[in-house]
From Swiss-Prot:
One of its GO terms (cellular component) is extracellular region. Keywords: Disulfide bond, Plant defense, Secreted, Toxin. One of its GO terms (molecular function) is toxin activity. This is Ligatoxin-A. It holds the Pfam family Thionin. Disulfide bonds join C3-C40, C4-C32, C16-C26. Thionins are small plant proteins which are toxic to animal cells. They seem to exert their toxic effect at the level of the cell membrane. Their precise function is not known. GO terms for biological process: defense response. It comes from Phoradendron liga.
Length: 46
């Protein structure tokens, strides 16, 4: 699961993923983070 700090970051992440880029790379580019659980930390709910 990916957690992003803003809607903008989420959009960047989603667009990046559409091009077939890996999750870790897209998370790094967009400022999002990948978590192993199912609930994002407070403030990372986008």
């Amino acid at each position: 699961k990916s957690c992003c700090p803003s809607t903008t970051a989420r959009n960047i992440y989603n667009t990046c993923r559409l091009t077939g880029t890996s999750r870790p790379t897209c998370a790094s580019l967009s400022g999002c983070k990948i978590i192993s659980g199912s609930t994002c930390b407070s403030g990372w709910b986008h």
